[in-house]
Amino acid sequence: MSVPAELKYTESHEWVRLEADGSVTVGITQHAQELLGDMVFVQLPDVGRALAQREDCAVVESVKAASDIYAPLGGEVIAVNSEVETSPEKINEDCYAAWLFKLKPANAGEVDGLLDAGGYQKLLDSEAH
């Protein structure tokens, strides 16, 4: 299973990419999309919405289940990927390219609380047993 080393991760299976401008891009991990199966619906937060860390802010729905997506960091939504709303299957095709939304973090220090690739792999290994 792919766990890209350059990303950060949450225990609820979101990935976070730190951008050069200080913003973060958020999506769901390969593990999450494999558990959910074929995506059929995505609901994203509104641009401009202020989110608290771990607040449920989006929904992905598959043929198997609906799953809440949580904000990995507190901050303001500065962009959403409307392409995944119209074509949810893009998440299944490449979950690391098919991002969901971008945040301007309110507290950059919250990034330090996220898992690195090694920590996320350990989480996956523990869930498998």
UniProtKB/Swiss-Prot annotation:
InterPro entries linked to this entry: 2-oxoA_DH_lipoyl-BS (IPR003016), Biotin_lipoyl (IPR000089), GCV_H (IPR002930), GCV_H/Fam206 (IPR033753), GCV_H_sub (IPR017453), Single_hybrid_motif (IPR011053)
One Gene Ontology cellular component annotation held by this UniProt entry: glycine cleavage complex
Residue stretches in coiled coil: none
Record's keyword terms, sorted: Lipoyl
Protein origin, superkingdom: Bacteria
Record's cofactor remark: Binds 1 lipoyl cofactor covalently.
Chain positions with N6-lipoyllysine modification: 64
A biological-process GO annotation: glycine decarboxylation via glycine cleavage system
Gene3D superfamilies: 2.40.50.100
Domain Lipoyl-binding: 23-104
Cofactor needs: (R)-lipoate
Family in the record: Belongs to the GcvH family.
Job description of the protein: The glycine cleavage system catalyzes the degradation of glycine. The H protein shuttles the methylamine group of glycine from the P protein to the T protein.
Listed NCBIfam families: gcvH, PRK01202.1
Complexes and interactors: The glycine cleavage system is composed of four proteins: P, T, L and H.
HAMAP family reported in the protein's UniProt record: GcvH
Annotated protein name in UniProt: Glycine cleavage system H protein
Organism this protein belongs to: Nitrosomonas europaea (strain ATCC 19718 / CIP 103999 / KCTC 2705 / NBRC 14298)
